[in-house]
Amino acid sequence: MAEAFRGEYNQKVDAKARVSIPAPFRRVIEAGDPKFSGGRSSFVLVYGGDRSYVECYTISEMERIEERIRSLPMGTPKRRYLERNMITLALNMELDEDGRIVLPPKGREKLGISPDELKGGTEATFAGTLNKFQIWKADIYAAELAAEEEVLLPPGADMLSLLEETGL
């Protein structure tokens, strides 16, 4: 079984837009980077789609997604949408020697991090979601989490009840 991105981490984003990738996520990124041999590891940051966060995939996971997109008939609306939002609006990222990345301008725009917020310092939340992780502006993530739980579960309900629909 492949390694998974698990957990939730709040990380400072400095004035130069540098942010440290959580150490447990770095291990999964390394395991999913076929070219990694002890130096710098890489992953793919996707900023496409109608959402307020970016999604990050290991190189291996992104290759699987690309194969699935390639299997769709050329020129179909589904394929064009996926190509645009998963391939065109994506960047290869490389961790520096300290395990950091510079959040690219398009990623900062997607997260809603303004230049003024960078100057004053801001925080990003990294959320593991099995085969990928998300990067959110911390305050937006907290608000989204609260709203999502309110919609999906009544107070005191067992969250595993959501799996009943899958038959697992």
Curated annotation (Swiss-Prot):
PROSITE patterns: SPOVT_ABRB (PS51740)
A GO term, aspect molecular function: DNA-binding transcription factor activity
A single BP term in Gene Ontology: negative regulation of DNA-templated transcription initiation
Keyword line: Cytoplasm, DNA-binding, Repeat, Transcription, Transcription regulation
Span of domain SpoVT-AbrB: 8-51, 90-140
InterPro entries: MraZ, MraZ_C, MraZ_dom, MraZ_N, MraZ_sf, SpoVT-AbrB_dom, SpoVT-AbrB_sf
Gene3D superfamilies, per database record: Transcriptional regulator MraZ domain
Oligomer status and interactors: Forms oligomers.
Name of the protein: Transcriptional regulator MraZ
Species the sequence originates in: Cereibacter sphaeroides (strain KD131 / KCTC 12085)
Taxonomic path: Bacteria, Pseudomonadati, Pseudomonadota, Alphaproteobacteria, Rhodobacterales
